[in-house]
UniProtKB/Swiss-Prot annotation:
Keywords in alphabetical order: 4Fe-4S, ADP-ribosylation, ATP-binding, Iron, Iron-sulfur, Metal-binding, Nitrogen fixation, Nucleotide-binding, Oxidoreductase
Organism: Synechococcus sp. (strain JA-2-3B'a(2-13))
One annotated GO molecular function: ATP binding
Listed name of the protein: Nitrogenase iron protein
Higher taxonomy: Bacteria, Bacillati, Cyanobacteriota, Cyanophyceae, Synechococcales
Function text: The key enzymatic reactions in nitrogen fixation are catalyzed by the nitrogenase complex, which has 2 components: the iron protein and the molybdenum-iron protein.
Domain of life per record: Bacteria
Length: 292
């Protein structure tokens, strides 16, 4: 069994990419479980055609303990037999959502939820912002990390940060970076830019997903593109990505770069203006722009 995780900047399309890719993998006969590691509990809605499934933490809070929760109450079967679980999280402003991930994964392991699977896919909230959200990496649960990004500055910044998290636990836990998945935002020279970032991070751009309105049309119906419009070009893009992940053996220890190197890359591709141009635009000298 392979355990993989999808990380990336909040709002980049991780859950959509994860579920559509898993649908493609299931089409190819893979036995898969999605574990949603996000308090929003939206990691399985396209597979189950529902708003949000009941989470492990919600049921544990209702019952008083996670030991009082039954596996079949939180593991639901979705599109093409994909098993779906949501870890959930506490009420806003109370407690640690990262603890929900830890509790849920331990519960699943202890109750034999991972038996007879080819893949477990963790869909993890946003950046590596705290130890709890890094838990699938830190505890050696996820062995392959796929970073969903785009040619936008903050998406690339997040990708570099996530690479730092992978590097931190690469030697102790054996986790590796499987590649970058570019979920296009139609940024100029986006493919070249992500390929350049991938090279600097000692990885590759595994796949470029073009922007297509059919993704939103499918989501409005709580379906993956592969189920909603199986013959469209976008469905084939997700199938291609699914095959690449299944066949991927090129797993590497990343080499994250400094903020200065990242900014220089963005300047080189015209995403950011250099200090001279910014100084000219705001009527200051480069010296005045320098950090104190």
């Amino acid at each position: 069994m392979r355990q993989i995780a999808f990380y990336g900047k909040g709002g980049i399309g991780k859950s959509t990419t994860c579920q559509n890719t898993v649908a493609g993998m299931a089409e190819l006969g893979q036995r898969i479980m999605i574990v949603g590691c996000d308090p929003k509990a939206d990691s399985t809605r396209l597979m189950l055609h529902c708003k949000a499934q009941t989470t492990v933490l919600h049921l544990a809070a209702e019952r008083g303990s996670v030991e009082d929760v039954e596996l079949e109450e939180v593991v639901l079967t979705g599109y093409r037999g994909v098993r779906c679980v949501e870890s959930g999280g506490p009420e806003p402003g109370v407690g640690c959502a990262g603890r929900g991930i830890i509790t849920a994964i331990n519960f699943l392991e202890e109750n034999g939820a991972y038996e007879d699977l080819d893949f477990v896919c963790y869909d993890v909230l946003g950046d590596v912002v705290c130890g709890g959200f890094a838990m699938p990496i830190r505890e050696g649960k996820a062995q392959e990390i796929y970073i969903v990004c785009s040619g936008e500055m903050m998406a690339m910044y997040a990708a570099n940060n996530i690479a730092r998290g992978v590097l931190k636990y690469a030697y102790s836990g054996g986790v590796r970076l499987g590649g970058l998945i570019c979920n296009s935002r139609k940024v100029d020279r986006e493919i070249e830019l992500i390929e350049a970032l991938a090279e600097k991070l000692n990885t590759k751009m595994l796949h470029f997903i073009p922007r297509d309105n059919v993704v939103q049309h499918a989501e409005l119906r709580r379906m993956t593109v592969i189920e909603y419009s199986p013959d469209c070009n976008q469905a084939d893009e997700y199938r291609a990505l699914a095959k690449k992940i299944i066949n991927n053996t090129d797993l590497r220890i990343p080499t994250p770069i400094s903020m200065d190197e990242l900014e220089q890359l963005l300047i080189e591709f015209g995403v950011l203006d250099d200090d001279q141009k910014i100084a000219h635009l705001i009527g200051k000298t480069e010296k005045e722009l320098a950090p104190v």
